[in-house]
């Protein structure tokens, strides 16, 4: 195998591994449809959503979700919770997931917007890990590339 072909193969494998590392799973629910989505959060009847399988948004063509989000909103004295995949922004405030963006408005409206990507399901309430298949796939690809580079 020529040197250029080895570098191209290495780049392809690296891109595949990076894609595996970016995939995150998030809870997807609304408390106005399901009271278990509120706080305290009860995920016993909810399935976690693979954000890589989330539909492309019409107003964000080509943008894929990379984080989870949890929105806590108080409108006219009533609390609402929204949990889903997040397409834009950064985790937490300045990268610190312990902090959320808070906004208040007229008409007794309050909103807390939290984003995270540290682990699957991080939008449940408050270190993204690859699953076993991701680790095995990465290991297998690494062995194959190492073997091909030695030839």
Curated annotation (Swiss-Prot):
Pfam families in the record: QVR
Note: The name crooked reflects the excessively long and convoluted tracheal dorsal trunk phenotype of mutant larvae. Should not be mistaken for the proteins crooked legs (crol) or crooked neck (crn).
Record protein name field: UPAR/Ly6 domain-containing protein crok
InterPro entries hit by this protein: QVR-like, Sleep_regulator
Cytoplasmic compartment segments: 150-151
Function text: Required for septate junction assembly, possibly by organizing the preassembly and transport of septate junction proteins including dlg1/disks large 1 and Nrx-IV/Neurexin-IV. Involved in paracellular barrier functions of trachea, hindgut and salivary gland mediated by epithelial cell septate junctions.
Record family assignment: Belongs to the quiver family.
Membrane topology note: Lipid-anchor; GPI-anchor
Topology feature Lumenal, residues: 24-128
GO biological process: regulation of synaptic transmission, cholinergic; regulation of tube size, open tracheal system; rhythmic process; septate junction assembly; sleep
Propeptide residues, chain positions: 125-151
């Amino acid at each position: 195998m020529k040197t250029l072909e080895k570098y191209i193969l290495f780049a392809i494998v690296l891109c595949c591994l990076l894609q595996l590392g970016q995939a995150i799973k998030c809870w997807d629910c609304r408390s106005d449809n399901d009271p278990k989505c509120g706080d305290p959060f009860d995920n016993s009847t909810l399935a976690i959503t693979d954000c890589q399988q989330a539909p492309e948004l019409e107003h964000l063509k080509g943008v894929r979700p990379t984080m989870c989000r949890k929105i806590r909103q108080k409108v006219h004295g009533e609390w609402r919770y929204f949990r889903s995949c997040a397409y834009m922004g950064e985790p937490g405030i300045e990268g610190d997931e312990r902090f959320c963006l808070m906004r208040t408005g007229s008409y007794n409206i309050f909103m807390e917007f939290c984003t995270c990507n540290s682990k699957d399901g991080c939008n449940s309430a408050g270190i993204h890990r690859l699953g076993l298949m991701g680790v095995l796939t990465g290991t297998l690809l690494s062995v194959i590339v190492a073997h091909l580079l030695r030839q």
